[in-house]
């Protein structure tokens, strides 16, 4: 009997070991740190616990670190992660440098990944020359928060009836609240690059940054109007100033309307603000657009990666999409997997309007080969064009020149 029991235990141990050996191990790098990093780690842990075929090792780091380390790993052929999360704007340049592999859509379909399962505004932006280089985890961007208690107090709710807030309505709300004794600010100028690109997208057809795909070429009249609108709001006293802590002002009831990222929702909740979310402030509700981005799963080039590992990655990515409710709830993001649209808990979240397929044309996701250079150039003129340090025409010319010079220097 003892020999039989020992034999059975030995077989169980052997089978357990064989199962563990059969698991495919993949390395995953992400740009999520801090609170988002902890939430992402929890999602990875949930995947690992859900099955025994794939083990995912998650390495979080800042976006800047990842964008420096991964190309170096590809060049040396050493330490290349099997899957990464990157911002969608970076994908065209990675493809141009031949740093990314496209997905085998037949293979990933075996794991459940299909185009129709995803937010189309995000999916198509990572389709290049009919090849799919990214699978979106989410869409996220710069929208509008309002302090509902202040709106109730000062009788401002009529401007919310259609679900949009225009620039004229911002001024109307500020004037009406001030007439009743409100001493705070109406609106903020915060991360101006994100605000400006949302407003520009409402005016420039296709929110173009280039004509030929390479050289910078802005719609100058559209950019000028967007900049002039921000400058006018500042000069007329409706907005926060350069030195203001605009977030604290909103948390403390000293601001009516706050332009911020959806990822700040948890902080607003923690501050105890009774709030609602709307699209970015617009010129015309018929053409409302908000600057948006998307975290995408990509696979950097690695000749040693096997088909088995590619399938393991696909299983992981599909799980993350189907189980991204926590990403919406705790990280404040908008899952790109459309199955979440049918989940009542998500539908009740304030950012859920960004997932509405009928409103995908309101998501201004930018696509430009030299996005990194453009991002640096447009960010450099923040506040300068608002406070008059630089003339608006000169600011626009400076953006284009800086990008063109940087391209020429490569």
What function would you assign to each model-found segment?
Residues 278, 329-384, 410:
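Long, aromatic- and glycine/proline-rich binding clefts that accommodate carbohydrate-like moieties
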């Amino acid at each position: 009997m003892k020999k039989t029991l020992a034999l059975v235990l030995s077989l169980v141990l052997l089978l357990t070991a064989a199962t563990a050996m059969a698991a495919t191990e993949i390395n995953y790098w992400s740009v999520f740190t801090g609170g988002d990093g902890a939430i992402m780690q929890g999602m990875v842990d949930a995947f690992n616990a859900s099955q025994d075929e794939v083990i995912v090792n998650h390495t979080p780091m800042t976006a800047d670190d990842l964008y420096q380390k991964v190309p170096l790993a590809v060049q040396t052929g050493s330490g290349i992660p099997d899957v990464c999360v990157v911002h969608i704007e970076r994908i065209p340049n990675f493809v141009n440098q031949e740093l990314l592999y496209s997905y085998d859509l037949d293979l990933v379909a075996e794991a459940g990944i299909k185009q129709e399962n995803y937010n189309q505004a995000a999916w198509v932006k990572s389709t290049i020359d009919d090849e799919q280089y990214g699978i979106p985890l989410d869409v996220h961007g710069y929208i509008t928060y309002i302090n509902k208690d202040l709106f109730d107090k000062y009788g401002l709710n009529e401007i919310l009836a259609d679900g949009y807030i225009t620039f004229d309505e911002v001024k109307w709300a500020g004037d009406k609240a001030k007439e009743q004794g409100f001493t705070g600010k109406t609106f903020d100028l915060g991360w101006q690059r994100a605000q400006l690109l949302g407003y520009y997208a409402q005016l420039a057809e296709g929110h173009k940054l280039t004509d030929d795909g390479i050289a910078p070429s802005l719609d100058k009249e559209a950019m000028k109007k967007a900049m002039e609108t921000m400058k006018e709001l500042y000069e007329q006293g409706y907005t926060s100033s350069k030195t203001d802590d605009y977030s604290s002002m909103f948390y403390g009831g000293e601001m009516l309307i706050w332009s911020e990222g959806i990822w700040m929702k948890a902080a607003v909740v923690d501050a105890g603000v009774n709030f609602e979310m709307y699209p970015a402030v617009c010129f015309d509700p018929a053409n409302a657009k908000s600057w948006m981005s998307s975290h995408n799963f990509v696979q950097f080039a690695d000749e040693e990666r096997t088909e088995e590992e590619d399938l393991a990655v696909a299983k992981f990515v599909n799980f993350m999409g189907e189980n991204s409710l926590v990403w919406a709830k705790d990280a404040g993001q908008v899952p790109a997997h459309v199955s979440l649209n049918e989940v009542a808990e998500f539908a009740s979240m304030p950012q859920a309007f960004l997932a509405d397929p009928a409103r995908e044309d309101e998501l201004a996701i930018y696509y430009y080969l030299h996005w990194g250079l453009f991002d640096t150039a447009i960010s450099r003129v923040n506040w300068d064009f608002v406070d008059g340090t630089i003339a608006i025409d000169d600011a626009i010319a400076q953006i284009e020149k800086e990008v063109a010079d940087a391209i020429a220097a490569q």
